[in-house]
Amino acid sequence: MTDHALLLVNLGSPASTSVADVRRYLNQFLMDPYVVDLPWPVRRLLVSLILIKRPEQSAHAYASIWWEEGSPLVVLTRRLQAAMVEHWPHGPVEIAMRYGQPALPDVLERLAAQGVRKVTLAPLYPQFADSTVTTVVDLAKQTVSERQLPLQMRVLQPFYEHPAYIEALAASARPHLETGYDHLLLSFHGLPERHLKKLFPKGVKHDLRAADCCHGATAEVRSVCYRGQCLATAKAFAQKMGIPDGKWSVSFQSRLGRDKWIEPYTETRLDELAKAGVKKLLVMCPAFVADCIETLEEIGMRGSEQFVEAGGRELVLVPCLNDHPEWVRVLADMCEKA
């Protein structure tokens, strides 16, 4: 075994469905300044208020999708890790979570102790956002610096419209699309508009409510516009699959709080599509590479119930890439070239 490790990093999960474990996880997640980007005193107060009721609600949601082996997100990421081993001959393949266990700093320290000297860090997020990619990369760099770990790092960059990634999405989703459907909704995780606006170059006007917000935008703007990258993923996928305009659309889910988030909202689109006569709705969640509470519970359970209550007949959740063989091959190749 050589000294070059591959480290796959995902968001994370509570250790269990207990209210105490969920509260601990939510506190770590929401206190990240890249997630709730407010001054510390305001963030602490807001998170403390959220933690009064949210842990019990979230614990119930986690319990509804929890597997015998544990958290679906962690289990599926470990399956991906196991599949990647034969595609990475340079050293160990490990996983880490930004929040919860296995903790990213601890995994980096363990790799260094094992004699690893180079790490390819792979944040498992196709699109760029401070609250996903930046927080992972910054924590990794901070850990290496503060703990004086003898590690050289290179980072897998966002791959939202990489042709091979789009091909992997197509290979994974094709069997589900071939069963027939009335409409395909590509539901991405949402973000507050201010998370995007603060990254745009000063003086740049960028309409985050436009149908194609990055049309004509500079490369600098496109590199930090999460909404535009999501739209690019969706458009590339629809073109790859030959899905005509009008039979697919994009929305953004998981809104939290009262701030303005990027639109259109998934909960709104579910009602609109049902009322427009869509009976069989397929939903994909391409911001996630592994199924998790946002896909299995928010869309697969609550979203399905909402769609049927609004007049639809059936909502079919298309699984994420998880450990699909084509995704494993594509991810290994992208990491090799990172």
UniProtKB/Swiss-Prot annotation:
Subcellular location: Cytoplasm
GO BP terms: heme biosynthetic process
Catalytic activity: heme b + 2 H(+) = protoporphyrin IX + Fe(2+)
Binding site for Fe cation: 189, 294
Alphabetized GO MF terms: ferrochelatase activity; metal ion binding
InterPro entries: Ferrochelatase, Ferrochelatase_C, Ferrochelatase_N
Enzyme Commission number(s): 4.98.1.1
Enzymatic class: lyase
An annotated GO cellular component: cytoplasm
Pathway terms, separated by semicolons: Porphyrin-containing compound metabolism; protoheme biosynthesis; protoheme from protoporphyrin-IX: step 1/1
Keyword annotations: Cytoplasm, Heme biosynthesis, Iron, Lyase, Metal-binding, Porphyrin biosynthesis
HAMAP family in UniProt: Ferrochelatase
Family: Belongs to the ferrochelatase family.
Function of the molecule: Catalyzes the ferrous insertion into protoporphyrin IX.
Name under which the protein is recorded: Ferrochelatase
Organism: Pseudomonas putida (strain ATCC 700007 / DSM 6899 / JCM 31910 / BCRC 17059 / LMG 24140 / F1)
